[in-house]
Amino acid sequence: MEEAKKDDSLSNVAEYSVSEISHALKRTIEDTFGHVRVRGEISGFRGAHSSGHCYFSLKDERARMEAVIWKTTFARLRFPPQEGLEVIATGRLTTFPGSSKYQIVIESLEPAGAGALMALLEERKRKLAAEGLFAESRKRPLPFMPHVIGVVTSPTGAVIRDIIHRITDRFPVHVVVWPVRVQGETTGAEVAAAISGFNALQPGGTIPRPDILIVARGGGSLEDLWGFNDEAVVRAAAASAIPLISAVGHETDWTLIDLAADRRAPTPTGAAEVAVPVKAELEANIARLSARLKGAISRCLDRRRQETRSLARALPSPDQLFALPRRRFDEAAGRLGRALQTSTQGKRLHLNAVRVSIATLDRRIAQARRDANQCGERLPLVYQGLVRHRRARFDRDAARVSPRVTLQRITTLGERLKIAIARKDRAVSLRVERARTVYEQAVRLAESLSYKSVLERGFALVRDGEDRPLKRASDVKPGETLRLQFADGNIGAISTGKSSNTNRKSAPAREPGKQGSLF
């Protein structure tokens, strides 16, 4: 009885074809789950198919799920899938009726956790470093004084206000901001496009081309700063023809753009300090250097002026220089007058000698006519010779005045001038030295001949009342007033008329047997 009831219930179950049940399952799964986020490890990824689509699996310890990324979605992914990478896939669940399998159609893909991000970051860092994008040889020096600064950042955050405020305080320059999103899936593409856009600007255009670029963002987590690790951003920074400063995050935050940039700043404010110097310090340095330059020029001019005065004192006076030429000119003028008189007399005698008759004049005229005819016949030949001579002389002059020859002559004359100046300096120095030696010898001779040196040895100079020196005792009269000049002063005296010489007392006789003095 029970078996009969069971058979009746089974006969009431709806009957489906394979296609019907497959499509019913497909609708049920798609309607029930819709969009889901699935965490798993990528397995079986071999790159994009020839059609541009990607097929692989997501797995964990107990299950596996097929996954597909369509061509249009794959081109928009922030990073490509990699074998063995743990990811979080967002997409729609669906089934494929032809094989009775369910799969996830992935619309976005992101690494699962900081560990996966760090692994992906290290892999991307090794790849780009192997291409030489982080090499120090690629980095360019920053301009000392940029006129225009391009900033790639969010136009509404505190970062751009801090940068502009710091630049205004240090050295106000023109700032051009390229607005981008600094967080999200489109960050990498927008930042790369901004760097390339600044480099595409032409000098002198409507928008000025920056002299330096600053890519800036405030601090954040690894996920927040992930857009600045994008491969497109790193390649754009490395290819930038404009020097680039990276100021992403705080001092402890590092991104791949920091390695590709020409300079890394710890903060956006630090990037502004690196980009421009302090105007007040520059003005102070310029003032100090200007004062030093003026002092050096003044000292140099004073030294040259003193040297010129010394040389001028050593040179002879104009009267001494022109004395001999003036005398020669006077002598030549006298000889010229006498020569003119002699020549006039000779011409007058010659004129008297040639006063002849009419016949003599006719003969001389005929002779002059014949000479003129001969000269007329020789004139074309002489003219041609003169033309050839002038042409040859012109060619020689043209060769001499060529730029190369002129430069050689200028160089030669410059060398001769240097040699002449050196010879002049040596001659002046030698003449000054000789004059100094003669002067010193004259001083020593005058000192040796002065009577004062004799007074120093204990002698005295006797003068009479009229201050005339007395040479003999006979010149002194009794009672005459005298003046005696010693080395240290003068005293007065009166002559007594008697000789002051007295006989010396003889030495007493010595007793016999005692030895006396030798003197």
Curated annotation (Swiss-Prot):
GO biological process: DNA catabolic process
InterPro entries reported for this sequence: Exonuc_VII_L (IPR003753), Exonuc_VII_lsu_C (IPR020579), OB-fold_nuc-bd_dom (IPR025824)
Class of this enzyme: hydrolase
Major localization class: cytoplasm
Subcellular location: Cytoplasm
Keyword Coiled coil included in the entry's annotation: no
CC per GO annotation: cytoplasm; exodeoxyribonuclease VII complex
Reaction(s) the record says it catalyses: Exonucleolytic cleavage in either 5'- to 3'- or 3'- to 5'-direction to yield nucleoside 5'-phosphates
Keywords: Cytoplasm, Exonuclease, Hydrolase, Nuclease
EC number: 3.1.11.6
A Pfam family of this chain: tRNA_anti_2
Listed GO MF terms: exodeoxyribonuclease VII activity; nucleic acid binding
Disordered: region residues: 493-519
SS bond list: none
Polar residues bias: start-end ranges: 496-505
Oligomer status and interactors: Heterooligomer composed of large and small subunits.
Function text: Bidirectionally degrades single-stranded DNA into large acid-insoluble oligonucleotides, which are then degraded further into small acid-soluble oligonucleotides.
Family named by the database record: Belongs to the XseA family.
Protein name, entry field: Exodeoxyribonuclease 7 large subunit
Organism listed in the record: Chelativorans sp. (strain BNC1)
